[in-house]
Amino acid sequence: MTASTATETLLHKGSGLQVVVGLGQSGLSVAHYLAEQGYQVAVTDNQENPALANKLPATIDIRQFGAIDAELLQQAARIIISPGISLDNVAIAAARAANIPVVSDIQLFCEACTVPIVAITGSNAKSTVTTLVGQMAADAGINVGVGGNIGVPALSLLSNKEMELAVIELSSFQLETVTNLGAQVATVLNMSPDHLDRHGDMLGYHQAKHRIFQGAKSVVINREDALTRPLVSDSLPRLSTGIHAPNKGHYGLITDTAGQTYLARGTERLISADKLKIKGRHNLLNAQAALALGELAGLPLEIMLITLQQFAGLEHRCQYVSTVAGIDYFNDSKGTNIGSTMAAVEGLGAVYAPKDGKLLLILGGQGKGQQFGELSPFINQYVSQVLFIGEDGKQIEQHLRAAGLSDEVSLHQCQTLENAFATIEQVTASSLSQVQAVLLSPACASFDQFDGFVARGEHFSQLVKQLDVVS
């Protein structure tokens, strides 16, 4: 362990020492914020030489690296924990047992923020909806800050003194230490199993997510997912979203006699789904969520609809790549859990099913102990070919077969994306092929073969472009 000041000389907790645990981007933002506020700050991190240590303010000379310093934590007036640090960490648990407050950067942000907050969480689509709402606000001429789990630390937004609205994406890790967020509008977009190794079970995960509703002035609810419904007063303003025709004032979908689907608010048809650049039923829910959040934040509907029509989605999130030889290719490399892949398969599958089209699905990577059999009903309905890649490809195939995968679905062990594309050319060359779209939505982490989901998605897109050149 390295330290520029011995633990024995540190201040006692009654004197206001603020200890930042974890020196990632959020921890660094906390350190700068607290130092600027005039606090005495200490930083501790498990890494011996944290990459961001040289970016700490010079005034912070208490730096305990190599392990989280339990003795240092016991001397804190307040501990600010980074999202990657579990509350079950021995040193953190001991500090909490000693009644030392443990909070996150989000707690500091909501206490300091003086503008309305749009708070967004969910198992999937958080970044898409957060980005979309932020763009809607910007297009409406509002000075908006967008941050949180989306890559920009929330505290850094406070440097914009002209900010009129904050739109923040929140993870369950960030929320588990937040009390009374007080958002102008809050939502849990959807809920599916994720991070259970951290939260223990779905109950713990659900409880963490729903902390977003504490102190909220209004809420948005997904009618299709009972787990998103908050336990809040019936008098609290709320809007809901769903895949069916909505009640008056709420959002949903209306399909006319010709089979055309529209985003709707009550009986009012707002925009045809065909006019949107983002595709799939799940993206229609995302679009509704953004509209509902924007409405409760005071954004004008006409501006939001213009933004929505222009919005092309985010990279690696059901991103349309190209059409080659009549087949559409979609990059959903960010789909690193089964819930995300379910949404992508169902969402895109419903687009091609009316045209008797099927999906070719690329699955695999590091499975994280998930039960992939839950994908079988979705694959049976919308997929004709499954190509497996990565270290857990064979295990995923076993899960699907054991869960009643249809014999009509062809399975291929490909190991790599290069092999997968060779297989794609073979299976789609047949005149009997029903494949109208290829979807990379691995439902797995990527670190067995790539530096991350971005690298995996970029490689997929490059292989598609090579196909395009050849064709």
Curated annotation (Swiss-Prot):
This is UDP-N-acetylmuramoylalanine--D-glutamate ligase. It comes from Psychrobacter cryohalolentis (strain ATCC BAA-1226 / DSM 17306 / VKM B-2378 / K5). It is found in: Cytoplasm. Its EC number is 6.3.2.9. SUPFAM superfamilies: MurCD N-terminal domain (SSF51984), MurD-like peptide ligases, catalytic domain (SSF53623), MurD-like peptide ligases, peptide-binding domain (SSF53244). One of its GO terms (cellular component) is cytoplasm. The gene is murD. Keywords: ATP-binding, Cell cycle, Cell division, Cell shape, Cell wall biogenesis/degradation, Cytoplasm, Ligase, Nucleotide-binding, Peptidoglycan synthesis. One of its GO terms (molecular function) is ATP binding. Pfam families: Mur_ligase_C, Mur_ligase_M, MurD-like_N. The keyword Ligase applies. Cell wall formation. Catalyzes the addition of glutamate to the nucleotide precursor UDP-N-acetylmuramoyl-L-alanine (UMA). Its main location: cytoplasm. Pathway: Cell wall biogenesis; peptidoglycan biosynthesis. It catalyses: UDP-N-acetyl-alpha-D-muramoyl-L-alanine + D-glutamate + ATP = UDP-N-acetyl-alpha-D-muramoyl-L-alanyl-D-glutamate + ADP + phosphate + H(+). Belongs to the MurCDEF family. ATP binds at residues 122-128. The keyword ATP-binding applies. Disulfide bonds: none annotated. One of its GO terms (biological process) is cell division.
